[in-house]
A protein has these predicted regions:
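Hydrophobic alpha-helical membrane context
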Residues: 14-15, 177
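Catalytic-core regions of glycoside hydrolase
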Residues: 30, 57-58, 133-345, 351, ...
Length: 580
């Protein structure tokens, strides 16, 4: 079966060789040296640093076999690079012993056409005690990085380069020294340039004092357009907030005219159900590329990064069907015009069975899964109303003492007695928190700016992203916003119930895999009710309106849901048997 999958995939990639193929197609692992995986839901890290020898000793056979399999899968999926460690990088990753271990991984992956990259901590020379500063304009710092690059390329001649998260969420960066992003990125790029390496500098930056978080990446980078060296690529998340189930495209992709860019997708399901729920992400990425294609006056993408969803689980992703997203990332970045339906069918036929009694219904299930999840989680443009910290489950009321305002759901949903949603227009909309729009729409080129700015033309699946909409506002189907919100949540729950029935009737694959996945679909249906009840009961406090008469009564009470607390951290999958 694996050999057949390899042949079929190679044929597909050859067939799409003339399509819009991104040059860089990289996995980004958010794996830490201690084996934990930030936002990882498939066990511990596959990179067993404590088991990899630093000197001349050979890699243990068990690890070597696992990494060879990893290389083969990436080659089959069309992925040509991997960043081994978390963007919240530990300075230890650039010590000589860790670089020797990295070189051993690179040696194993090289035959499969997979280059190795590393995330770096910008303050590494200072953190390791080798310098007193990490100021990018300090000659000693520049020399340190040049020598470190020489050391890396001596060990790994085809090393890809650095991924950098700087001055974001507490990570160090050039702004600590009064410098800007270009100063920091260019210093690193100069060190890597003689070796052909690149710097991928993340645009995920925001601060508590910055106003609308959706504006901040644009505001911080637009003035630096054209100031970055040729081997610097700005890595931008697909949307302007943070991998929500639905976001508009980040306006930076349209704004930067003289700077190389790559898109960052999240394959791991931080906001889309972890390893419990099934959410086929190709439709989300298809939406991104389709929107990007509506604007012709823009820089082409230099590549794509996908935050990996794998761990040391036997099946790589814990949820068997989540592996389709690893495949989809490789497939759609090799052919940015690929259809979601074709991607789903290819994967199911080559992985499970060619029996259409399975392939046809499960293809349809996958194609519906993302929209269904949006419906029962954050419909109509709602966003950032998940549980604090671990992000699993609904918590639109989340308000821990001492947290920054822009980490709280209220900052984004802005529910009040007037309406719901975030006014990101260039004009006033009635809202108890203030009438003025954030002006986010003005970061978009025409016709997107006008489309989003007018409540009557704004796509209704983004209306609460861009507008504070009155509860009694009449939507295009003739119903009020409140009734539409209720019915959309209801539709999501009903579809999640259908997924259980569809999977149950498609028992044409390995019985153990089928049973394992059955438990996840049953839990997903319960999660859909959890989300629906939590959000409607919470927002009903503001709307003061009853549920429509044909809307099912809630299963839970708001008090019970607000008392429930899931005690896990950012490195742990939600326990399927301890949820409401």
């Amino acid at each position: 079966m694996k050999k057949l999958f390899y042949i079929l995939t190679m044929l597909l990639l050859c067939h799409t060789a003339w399509a819009d193929k991104l040059e860089l197609r990289l996995l980004n692992h958010w794996d830490n040296p201690d084996g934990t995986v930030e936002r990882g839901y498939a066990g511990k890290s596959i990179w067993k640093w404590s088991m990899i020898p630093a000197g001349k000793k050979q890699m243990p056979d068990s690890l070597k076999a696992r990494y060879e399999e990893y290389g083969r899968i990436n080659q089959q999926y069309g992925i040509n690079g991997t960043v081994l460690n978390n963007v919240n990088a530990k300075p230890i990753m650039l010590t000589h012993s860790m670089l020797q271990k990295t070189a051993k991984i690179a040696d194993i992956l090289r035959p499969y056409g997979v280059k190795v990259y590393l995330s770096i901590n910008f303050a590494t020379p200072k953190a390791l005690g080798e310098l007193k500063t990490a100021d990018p304009l300090n000659p000693k710092v520049q020399t340190w990085w040049k020598k470190k690059a020489d050391e890396i390329y001596h060990l790994i001649p085809d090393f890809g380069g650095f991924l950098v998260k700087a001055n974001s969420e507490g990570e160090p960066g050039p702004m600590d020294y009064g410098r800007n992003h270009a100063d920091g990125a260019n210093m690193l790029a100069t060190a890597l340039e003689p070796h052909g390496g690149i710097v991928m500098w993340r645009a995920f930056v925001y601060s508590a004092q910055g106003g609308d978080r959706a504006n901040q990446a644009y505001d911080e980078f637009i003035g630096l357009d054209g100031q970055f060296k040729d081997n610097v690529i700005i890595q931008i998340k697909n949307g302007p907030i943070d991998f929500q189930p639905r976001e508009p495209v980040s306006p930076l992709f349209f704004a930067l005219k003289k700077t190389k860019m790559m898109v960052e997708f999240q394959i791991t399901q931080e906001y889309t159900g972890g390893s419990i729920q099934t959410c086929f992400l190709a439709p989300m990425w298809r939406e991104f590329f389709d929107t990007l294609g509506t604007i012709k006056d823009r820089q082409p993408l230099a590549g794509a990064a996908g935050v990996a969803n794998i761990g040391d689980a036997d099946n790589w992703t814990a949820n068997d069907l989540s592996m389709v997203n690893w495949y989809a990332f490789g497939r759609i970045t090799n052919d940015t015009e690929a259809s979601s339906k074709n991607i789903a069918r290819e994967y199911l036929r080559s992985t499970y069975t060619t029996d259409e009694r399975f392939v046809r219904p499960i293809t349809q299930l996958l194609l519906k899964s993302r929209e269904t999840m949006v419906d029962y989680m954050m419909p109509l443009g709602l966003h950032h109303i998940f549980a604090g910290g671990h992000h699993y489950g609904p918590e639109p009321w989340c308000n821990p003492k001492g947290w920054r305002e822009d980490w709280l759901p209220k900052f984004y949903h802005r529910a009040d007695s007037i309406g719901l949603g975030f006014n990101r227009t260039d004009h006033k909309e009635r809202c108890l928190a203030g009438d003025e729009g954030s002006g986010n729409v003005n970061q978009y080129p025409e016709p997107l700016r006008s489309l989003y700015n007018d409540i009557h033309t704004c796509p209704e699946n983004l209306i609460l992203w861009f507008h504070h909409v009155p509860w009694d506002y009449t939507m295009r189907n003739g119903l009020s916003l409140w009734d539409n919100l209720c019915y959309t949540y209801d539709r999501g729950v009903a579809e999640a119930d259908k997924f259980v029935d569809t999977w149950k009737a498609a028992a044409y694959i390995d019985s153990k895999v089928h049973a394992r996945q059955m438990k996840r679909f049953e839990r997903q249906a319960k999660d859909a009710r959890w989300w629906r009840d939590a959000c409607l009961l919470y927002f009903q406090q503001y709307s003061g309106m009853p549920l429509p008469p044909d809307s099912p009564a809630p299963t839970h009470t708001l008090d019970d849901l607000m008392r429930y607390h899931l005690d896990i951290d950012n490195y742990t999958a939600a326990p399927i048997d301890r949820l409401p």
